[in-house]
Structure formats: C-alpha cells, structure tokens
C-alpha cells in the first residue's frame, strides 16, 4: 500500500463560477485559476499522483499549456485515473477536506462524491469528503480563498 498527500488553494474572485468536486455551487464569487480552479479535485489529483510517485498536477497538466485553459478539473481527474491504471495502481480510498468559511458545503458533498466516483470509475464508498472552516482566521476565514487537502491510498495491481 502507498499513500499520497495533496493540497491546493485558490483565491476567490468575482465573475467566476465556484466549482468544487465538479459541482457548481451557487455563490457570489468563484475561484481564480487557469482551469476551473477546483481546489478539491486538484488536491485529490496531487494525492493520487504522489501515492504513485508520478509527480504532481503541474507536471501532467501545466498551467502554461493552453489545452488546459478553462478545462473542467473532472476531465483532469479522469486522465489521472487512467494514468494510475496504466502505471499499475488501483485506488484504495480518498479522504479529502475542503476549508472554506462560506458557502456551506454539506448540501453538495454527495454530488461531489458521485462525480469523483464516476471520473475515477471507483466505488463511491472509497471516497470521503469533509468540510470545515478556520473560524474566521487566515485567508479562508477572511473569505479570500478556499483550500483543500487530500490523502489517498493506492495499491499495486501488477
């Protein structure tokens, strides 16, 4: 068994959609980034790549590549899943946390889990997503951005 850790953060700005776990969440601001800036999916991708010693999201989907401009991070997650299988790994589980003062994430978590399950072609029971605040502290507490952390375990299937 191998374990990987992922982290991502993006700034909240006006005139952008807020996409987390492939779900569009109604909110007055969205996350700024080259792709759709889905911090949850980006953290999960990094944790999966890290568990397999395959680098990070920037290595496989660089923000200097126009092919990834505005792309749905769910597509990047699908590609990551294919890369893991090609490299001889299967996903045991994913546990992720979204850190945001607002909006409330609980109403959207099941749809996030479903999207991730479909993108990676794994059982939804292998995916856990939690949300927390920083009690008004730091950049997430001041509603300047949203961050996410993820830990994943994989096993060799070769």
UniProtKB/Swiss-Prot annotation:
A divalent metal cation binds at residues 8, 10, 42. It catalyses: 4-CDP-2-C-methyl-D-erythritol 2-phosphate = 2-C-methyl-D-erythritol 2,4-cyclic diphosphate + CMP. Keywords: Isoprene biosynthesis, Lyase, Metal-binding. Pathway: Isoprenoid biosynthesis; isopentenyl diphosphate biosynthesis via DXP pathway; isopentenyl diphosphate from 1-deoxy-D-xylulose 5-phosphate: step 4/6. Its EC number is 4.6.1.12. The keyword Transport does not apply. It comes from the Bacteria. The record marks 34, 133 as: Transition state stabilizer. Its cofactor is a divalent metal cation. One of its GO terms (biological process) is isopentenyl diphosphate biosynthetic process, methylerythritol 4-phosphate pathway. Binds 1 divalent metal cation per subunit. It is an enzyme of class 4 (lyase). 4-CDP-2-C-methyl-D-erythritol 2-phosphate binds at residues 8-10, 34-35, 56-58, 61-65, 100-106, 132-135, 139. It holds the Pfam family YgbB. The keyword Oxidoreductase does not apply. One of its GO terms (molecular function) is 2-C-methyl-D-erythritol 2,4-cyclodiphosphate synthase activity. Involved in the biosynthesis of isopentenyl diphosphate (IPP) and dimethylallyl diphosphate (DMAPP), two major building blocks of isoprenoid compounds. Catalyzes the conversion of 4-diphosphocytidyl-2-C-methyl-D-erythritol 2-phosphate (CDP-ME2P) to 2-C-methyl-D-erythritol 2,4-cyclodiphosphate (ME-CPP) with a corresponding release of cytidine 5-monophosphate (CMP). Belongs to the IspF family. Homotrimer. This is 2-C-methyl-D-erythritol 2,4-cyclodiphosphate synthase. The lineage of its organism: Bacteria, Bacillati, Bacillota, Clostridia, Eubacteriales. The gene is ispF.
């Amino acid at each position: 068994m191998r374990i990987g850790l992922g982290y991502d953060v993006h700034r909240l700005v006006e005139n952008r959609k807020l996409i987390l776990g492939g779900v569009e969440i109604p909110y007055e601001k969205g996350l700024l980034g080259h792709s759709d800036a889905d911090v949850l999916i980006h953290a999960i991708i990094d944790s999966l790549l890290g568990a397999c010693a395959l680098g990070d999201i920037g290595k496989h989907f660089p923000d200097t590549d126009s092919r990834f401009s505005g792309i749905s991070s769910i597509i990047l997650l699908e590609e990551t899943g294919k890369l893991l299988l090609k490299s001889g790994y299967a996903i045991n589980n994913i546990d992720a946390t979204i850190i945001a003062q607002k909006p409330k994430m609980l109403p959207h978590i099941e749809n996030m889990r479903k999207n991730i399950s479909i993108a990676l072609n794994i059982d939804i029971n292998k995916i856990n997503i939690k949300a927390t605040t920083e009690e008004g502290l730091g950049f997430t507490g001041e509603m300047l951005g949203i961050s996410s952390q993820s830990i994943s375990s994989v096993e060799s299937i070769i």
